[in-house]
């Protein structure tokens, strides 16, 4: 099998290694698509630690079953699957049978990668997004635009989309957002409708208070948290979905005085993520969620570095890259 691994800062190399055999409860999968995730940007940028070996990346996998180990008989050769595991930037990977789900019929593997939408669905499942809710999404990259689609399945009254990139705001409007704001305009939006009452132009649904019942932060950086705070209504909910990997992530104490609930949108529990993946893939099967406008770039196994470079540069037109070995 072939595998792409990071051998130095921003540099990957394709190696040929023996194809592993699945053990008990495992499945050997031929990888057909693997998403490039921002959570792996740091190891790609920094490369291996001194004395460390190559770094194998990729954890957003969809592929075809080619062999099963003992206790994995529910899967058949040739079935298309997605799930949790890695490394994904390779031609093959051994995955745990219990962490796989079937790719919905008629959906190509690159449009059915379960791991990223499962993490989004699980985060939303712990927030009170219901029919008629006002919801704001801060950050309109892959995660934010995915959240937008999943929020729409809950029939919200209003979706407020926030990002400094005008291209991202346009995408959000095309995917069903009602209002698209630059972060610099958030404070005025939050105050104007309240000042003007139910007739205020700022509130897309005519409500006296245009702030959101639920705010979903999907930037992973502290300025995103600062932008989110003014949009949370009193006794509303802020869900931190973005990955804040290191250091401190201070919150606006005004949330405290508003009686807001803060939800950690990260989930380390495999059973919860797999349940969320089941629900998310149902939305994919029902065409209520689609990767089509989100997967903007595709590369072969030799394009891993190019994919990460586009992501790191926030290149125009880029939302999500998929490696197709």
Residue ranges and their predicted role:
Residues 175-261:
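Glycine-rich cofactor phosphate-binding loops and adjacent beta1-alpha1 units
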Residues 248-296, 306:
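C-terminal substrate-binding/catalytic core of Rossmann-like NAD(P)-dependent dehydrogenases/reductases
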Residues 2, 209, 239, 243, ...:
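C-terminal capping/lid region of NAD(P)-dependent oxidoreductase domains
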Residues 85-97:
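A structural motif shared across PLP-dependent enzymes of the aminotransferase-like
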Residues 18-35, 47-87:
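Glycine-rich beta-strand-centered segment in the early N-terminal region that forms part
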Residues 110-185, 201:
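Mid-domain Rossmann-like dinucleotide-binding core that forms the NAD(H)/NADP(H) cofactor-binding site
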Residues 66, 160, 239:
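Conserved beta-strand positions in the Rossmann-like core of class I SAM-dependent methyltransferases
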């Amino acid at each position: 099998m072939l595998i792409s691994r990071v051998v130095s800062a921003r540099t990957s190399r394709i190696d040929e290694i023996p194809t592993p055999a699945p053990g008990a409860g495992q499945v050997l999968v031929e990888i057909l698509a693997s998403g490039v995730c921002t959570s792996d940007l740091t190891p790609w940028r920094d490369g291996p630690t001194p004395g460390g070996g190559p770094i194998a990346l990729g954890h957003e996998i969809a592929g075809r079953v080619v062999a099963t180990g003992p206790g994995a008989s529910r899967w058949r050769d040739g079935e298309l699957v997605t799930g949790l595991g890695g490394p994904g930037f390779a031609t093959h990977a051994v995955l745990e049978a219990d962490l796989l789900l079937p790719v919905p019929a008629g959906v190509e593997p690159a449009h059915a990668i379960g791991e990223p939408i499962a993490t989004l669905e699980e985060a939303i499942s712990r927030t009170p997004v219901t029919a008629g809710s006002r919801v704001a999404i801060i950050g309109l990259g892959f995660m934010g635009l995915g959240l937008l689609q999943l929020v729409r399945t809950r029939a919200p009254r209003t979706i407020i989309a926030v990002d400094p990139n005008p291209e991202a705001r346009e995408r959000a409007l095309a995917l069903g957002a009602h209002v698209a704001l630059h972060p610099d305009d958030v404070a005025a939006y939050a105050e104007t409708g309240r000042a003007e009452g139910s007739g205020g132009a700022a509130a897309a649904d005519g409500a006296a208070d245009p702030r959101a019942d639920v705010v979903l932060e999907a930037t992973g950086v502290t300025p995103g948290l600062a932008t989110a705070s003014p949009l949370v209504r009193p006794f509303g909910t802020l869900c931190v979905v973005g990955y804040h990997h290191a250091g401190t992530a201070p919150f606006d104490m005004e949330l405290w005085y508003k009686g807001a609930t803060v939800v950690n949108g990260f989930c380390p529990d495999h059973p919860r993520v797999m349940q969320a993946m089941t629900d998310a893939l149902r939305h994919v099967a029902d065409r209520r969620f689609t990767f089509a406008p989100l997967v903007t770039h595709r590369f072969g196994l030799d394009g891993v570095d190019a994919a990460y470079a586009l992501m790191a540069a926030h290149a125009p037109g880029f939302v999500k890259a998929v490696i197709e070995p």
